[in-house]
C-alpha cells in the first residue's frame, strides 16, 4: 500500500492512481472501499453537537459527506492543485453550487458566452429566476469581461476549452482582471482535465468539473466536483462576500472565514447549498470515478493523438467546409493551447459539411463506429449535432452567441485505433 507522506512530490500519473487512499489499515484491502451507509455514529452527545457546530471534523450524514466521497475529493484536489474539493451528483450541480456559495438575489456574475448548452441555459434562464444576473462577454476579448463588473459582481466564469466550440480561453488574463476588481475566477476545466491544464496554476480561484466526462472516462457515471484553490482572500473583501464573512444563523453564528480560513468557500459549499438542496454523489459513483481517474493520463494522450489525426484528415477532405480544432496550428487559439496545455487540445473537434444541415444528418446516420449521442470524454468515439441536441433550446441569436452553427457536427474522440476512426469518417462522408 502506498505511503502518502511524500504524496505532494508525486508526479501527476502517480497521484492519479494513489492520491487520497493508502489502503484500508484494518482489512488491508487496496481497492477503494464503497461505504454504502446513510449516517455515522457519534462517540457521545457532545461529539454530535460539535460536529453540527463545525467545531470538529467528521462524518454526519451521506448527503453532505461520505468516506468514499472523501477519497475522491482528496484525489481531485491533488490533481488540480487545490486545498480541498467537493464531489457532487453532477457537473451541473457543481456549477450551480459554486455560484450559490457566494451569490444571491441581486448579485451578478460575468461569464463567457461560449458555453456548454446546459450551462448556458442555467445562466441565461434559471439563475435569473433566483435573482442572479449573468452578464455575457466575448472570450476572445478579455477586456469585454471587465466592463460588466460592478459592486454586485461575485465572480468571472469561463470554460478552459469550450464545449462544443472547442475554443480556448486566456485564463491568465481573466484572472488578472478578476483579481484587480476583487472577485474570483471560476473555471470549468472539464474538457482538458487537470492532466492537460491546471487552471489554479494560472490564477483561477475555483475549478469546476463534470467528472462524468474525461475524469470518469467510460460513459458509466454522472458526477461533478468543485475544487477550491484556497488562495482567494475572501476576508479582505468582507462587503462583497458577506455570506463568508458574517455569522451564519443556520450554523449557530459560525463565520466561515474565521472557522475555516482558506477553506471558507469549499466549506460553505458543502454545508449550505449541498446540505440544503441535496445534490449528493452516491458512494458507488464516487468509486467509479476514482477507477476512471487511474487511467486518465493514458487515455488523454491517446485521445489527443487521435483528435489531431482526425482533424488533419477532415481538413483535407473535399466535402468538409471547415474544421475547428485548437490543436491545429492554423486555429486562432492554438497559441493558448501551447501556453496552457503544452500543445494538446483534448478530444473535442467540430466541423461543417458543404451540404449544410442535410449533409450533416446523412453523415451522422451513416456512421458505423462512432456512436451518436451527446456525451463527451468517453473511451468510445462519439458524434452529435449540437443545434438539434445539446443546444436545441437556444434560439438563433443564442446559437450564434454560443458559436453553434446549423451545419456543425461535434466529435468526441476516444481511444480506438485512429485508422479505424478515419475509415468510418471516410465512408460516412462519402454517403453524405
Q: What are these language model-derived features?
A:
Residues 277-280, 285-291, 295, 301-380, ...:
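Conserved small-domain helix->loop->beta segment predominantly found in fold-type I
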Residues 2-8, 16-18, 22-25, 85-316:
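Conserved PLP-enzyme active-site core in the AAT-like
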Residues 2-3, 83, 124, 133, ...:
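PLP-dependent enzyme catalytic core of the Aspartate aminotransferase-like
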Amino acid at each position: 500500500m502506498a505511503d502518502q507522506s511524500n504524496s505532494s512530490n508525486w508526479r501527476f500519473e502517480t497521484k492519479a492512481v494513489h492520491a487520497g487512499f493508502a489502503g484500508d489499515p484494518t482489512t488491508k484491502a487496496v481497492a477503494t472501499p464503497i461505504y454504502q451507509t446513510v449516517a455515522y455514529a457519534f462517540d457521545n452527545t457532545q461529539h454530535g453537537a460539535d460536529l453540527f457546530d463545525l467545531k470538529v471534523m467528521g462524518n454526519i450524514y451521506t448527503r453532505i459527506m461520505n468516506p468514499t466521497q472523501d477519497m475522491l475529493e482528496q484525489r481531485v484536489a491533488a490533481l488540480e492543485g487545490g486545498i480541498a474539493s467537493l464531489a457532487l451528483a453532477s457537473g451541473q450541480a457543481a456549477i450551480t453550487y459554486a455560484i450559490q456559495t457566494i451569490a444571491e438575489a441581486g448579485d451578478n456574475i460575468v461569464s463567457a458566452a461560449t458555453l456548454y448548452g446546459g450551462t448556458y441555459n442555467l445562466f441565461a434562464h434559471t439563475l435569473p429566476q433566483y435573482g442572479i444576473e449573468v452578464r455575457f462577454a466575448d472570450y476572445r476579448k478579455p477586456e469585454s469581461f471587465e466592463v460588466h463588473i460592478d459592486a454586485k459582481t461575485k465572480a468571472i466564469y469561463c470554460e478552459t476549452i469550450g464545449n462544443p466550440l472547442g475554443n480556448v480561453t486566456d485564463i491568465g488574463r481573466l484572472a488578472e482582471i478578476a483579481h484587480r476588481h476583487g472577485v474570483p475566477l471560476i473555471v470549468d476545466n472539464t474538457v482538458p482535465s487537470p492532466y492537460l491544464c491546471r487552471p489554479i496554476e494560472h490564477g483561477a480561484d475555483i475549478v469546476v468539473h463534470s467528472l462524468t466526462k474525461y475524469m470518469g472516462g467510460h460513459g458509466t457515471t454522472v458526477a461533478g466536483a468543485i475544487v477550491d484553490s484556497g488562495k482567494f482572500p475572501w476576508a479582505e473583501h468582507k462587503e462583497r462576500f458577506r455570506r463568508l464573512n458574517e455569522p451564519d444563523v443556520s450554523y449557530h453564528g459560525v463565520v466561515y472565514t474565521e472557522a475555516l480560513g482558506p477553506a471558507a468557500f469549499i466549506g460553505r459549499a458543502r454545508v449550505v447549498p449541498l446540505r440544503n438542496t441535496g445534490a449528493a454523489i452516491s458512494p458507488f459513483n464516487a468509486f467509479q470515478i476514482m477507477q476512471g481517474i487511474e487511467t486518465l493520463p493514458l487515455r488523454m494522450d491517446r485521445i489527443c493523438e487521435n483528435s489531431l489525426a482526425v482533424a488533419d484528415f477532415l481538413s483535407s477532405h473535399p466535402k468538409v467546409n471547415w474544421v475547428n480544432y485548437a490543436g491545429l496550428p492554423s486555429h486562432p487559439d492554438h497559441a493558448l493551447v501551447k501556453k496552457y496545455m503544452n500543445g494538446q487540445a483534448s478530444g473535442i473537434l467540430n466541423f461543417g459539411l458543404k451540404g449544410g444541415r442535410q449533409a450533416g444528418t446523412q453523415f451522422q446516420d451513416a456512421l458505423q463506429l462512432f456512436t451518436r449521442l451527446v456525451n463527451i470524454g468517453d473511451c468510445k468515439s462519439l458524434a452529435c449535432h449540437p443545434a438539434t441536441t445539446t443546444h436545441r433550446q437556444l434560439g438563433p441569436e443564442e446559437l450564434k452567441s454560443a458559436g453553434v452553427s446549423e451545419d456543425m457536427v461535434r466529435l468526441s474522440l476516444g481511444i480506438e485505433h485512429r485508422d479505424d476512426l478515419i475509415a468510418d469518417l471516410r465512408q460516412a462522408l462519402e454517403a453524405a
